């Protein structure tokens, strides 16, 4: 089948009818310019053709189905020849280097594609939808070629991480599903609306992805502007702190002056207080009575606070007990959930092992079928050579018989003799005798 596909790919462009060729151009456009306006992308949008099409003719359906089935086989083969994920050292330096290389490779991948049509002299105007069907198959083939080129690069140029391999597998499965649905729809109704719908949906997803990139770029610029504002605010705050420090120093100076003044005032007041001790003694007696009353009030208040403290302590102990019970409940639930997940993991491992055994059986069956096909071809080749040999021998026998019959007729061997005329002249008899003598000599 691979040889047939290679022979088909070597055909001149005139025999390809009107196929869709995908040309990859450039890197993904940046969504925001320096002035904040989005740039125009280089993606040439294909007009939406989602209205109901007339069913294709049976030869077109068979030809398109063959191409799509070949594409499906190539995608399935690609699934088996996918490389193993890159497993390097688990150090932090290696991981960071891997992330950087992955970002560079993703930037180099083509994301914008322009679709061009090649004129077809063999397709009439009654079948305008056939090139649109071939668009999907050709797009899948070009995608496979792109993936082959990526896989042929050395590991130092392209490091295929787990996320990249998962994305490639998802894209491959998506193409396989779309092509399978298209084949089923072609075989059922002779139309290809599911392919057009899938292309439209994928195009909408791509435009949504570009919008997300634009919003992200806008957010980055806003973050940069906010960082600049933060720097300005920090500068203003530092200036304000410096001014406040100067104000504090000034206040300290004033405090020193006030301390000096207070010392002078204390000296003056010392003499004044000695004169006022008697008056203050009377005031102290009255104040002592007031303080005793306040002490009684404080004692009662202290007892009340002690009682409240005991109530709060009891409440907190109850809450602690409840929390301990909840903690024990959650620990038991954690153990049960862990055991259940472990059982599920074991079941998944068993399923994986059974699937691997089934896959090995299928591979063994395929190898046996290939061996049977090769032996059948060898037997057919031997029978063909034998038939050709028999034909050659038959032709040789026929030629040999024809030569022998001609020789017998010319030399009159056996019952084959030349007819003679009854009325002959003497000259003719003499000539006849001369001929007989010649024939006798030849014999």
From Swiss-Prot:
Spans annotated as Disordered: 1-40, 415-443
UniProt keyword list: Calmodulin-binding, Cell projection, Cilium, Cytoplasm, Cytoskeleton, Differentiation, Flagellum, Spermatogenesis
Chain ranges of the IQ domain: 393-422
Encoding gene (name): IQCG
Domain of life: Eukaryota
Biased composition (Basic and acidic residues): 415-430
Residue intervals passing through the bilayer: none
Entry domain remark: The IQ domain mediates interaction with calmodulin when cellular Ca(2+) levels are low.
Assembly, per entry: Component of the nexin-dynein regulatory complex (N-DRC). Interacts (via IQ domain) with CALM when calcium levels are low. Does not interact with CALM in the presence of Ca(2+). Interacts with the HSP70 proteins HSPA1L and HSPA8. May form a complex with CAMK4 and HSP70.
Pfam family, one: IQ
CDD domains hit by this protein: IQCG
GO terms, molecular function: calmodulin binding
Described function: Component of the nexin-dynein regulatory complex (N-DRC), a key regulator of ciliary/flagellar motility which maintains the alignment and integrity of the distal axoneme and regulates microtubule sliding in motile axonemes. Binds calmodulin when cellular Ca(2+) levels are low and thereby contributes to the regulation of calcium and calmodulin-dependent protein kinase IV (CAMK4) activity; contributes to the regulation of CAMK4 signaling cascades. Required for normal axoneme assembly in sperm flagella, normal sperm tail formation and for male fertility.
Protein's UniProt name: Dynein regulatory complex protein 9
Biased composition (Basic residues): 431-443
């Amino acid at each position: 089948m691979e040889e047939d596909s290679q022979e088909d790919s070597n055909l001149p462009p005139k025999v390809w009818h009107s196929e869709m060729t995908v040309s990859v151009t450039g890197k993904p456009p940046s969504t925001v310019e320096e002035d904040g306006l989005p740039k125009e992308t280089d993606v040439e949008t294909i007009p939406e053709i989602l209205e109901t099409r007339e069913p294709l003719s049976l030869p077109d359906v068979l030809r398109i189905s063959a191409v799509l089935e070949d594409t499906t086989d190539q995608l399935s083969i690609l699934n088996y020849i996918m490389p193993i994920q890159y497993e390097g050292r688990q150090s932090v330096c290696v991981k960071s280097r891997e992330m950087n290389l992955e970002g560079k490779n993703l930037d180099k991948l083509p994301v914008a594609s322009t679709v061009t049509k090649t004129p077809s002299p063999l397709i009439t105007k009654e079948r305008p939808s056939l090139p649109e069907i071939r668009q999907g198959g050709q797009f899948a083939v070009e995608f496979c070629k792109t993936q082959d080129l990526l896989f042929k690069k050395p590991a130092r140029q392209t490091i295929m991480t787990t996320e990249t391999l998962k994305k490639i597998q998802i894209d491959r499965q998506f193409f396989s599903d779309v092509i399978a649905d298209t084949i089923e729809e072609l075989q059922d109704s002779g139309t290809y609306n599911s392919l057009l719908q899938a292309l439209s949906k994928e195009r909408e997803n791509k435009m949504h992805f570009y919008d997300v990139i634009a919003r992200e770029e806008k957010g980055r610029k806003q973050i940069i502007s906010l960082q600049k504002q933060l720097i300005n605010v920090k500068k203003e705050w530092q200036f304000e702190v410096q001014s406040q420090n100067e104000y504090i120093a000034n206040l300290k100076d004033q405090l020193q002056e006030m301390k000096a003044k207070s010392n002078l005032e204390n000296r003056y007041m010392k003499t004044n207080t000695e004169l006022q001790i008697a008056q203050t003694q009377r005031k102290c007696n009255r104040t002592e009575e007031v303080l005793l009353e306040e002490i009684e009030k404080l004692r009662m208040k202290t007892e009340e606070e002690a009682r409240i403290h005991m109530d709060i302590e009891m409440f907190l102990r109850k809450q602690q007990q409840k929390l301990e019970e909840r903690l024990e409940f959650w620990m038991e639930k954690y153990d049960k959930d862990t055991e259940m997940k472990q059982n599920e993991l074991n079941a998944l491992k068993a399923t994986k092992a059974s699937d691997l055994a089934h896959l090995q059986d299928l591979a063994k069956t395929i190898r046996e079928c290939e061996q049977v096909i090769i032996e059948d071809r060898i037997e057919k080749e031997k029978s063909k050579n034998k038939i050709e040999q028999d034909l050659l021998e038959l032709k040789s026998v026929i030629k040999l018989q024809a030569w022998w019959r001609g020789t017998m007729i010319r030399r009159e061997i056996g019952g084959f003799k030349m007819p003679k005329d009854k009325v002959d002249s003497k000259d003719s008899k003499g000539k006849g005798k001369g001929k007989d003598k010649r024939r006798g000599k030849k014999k």
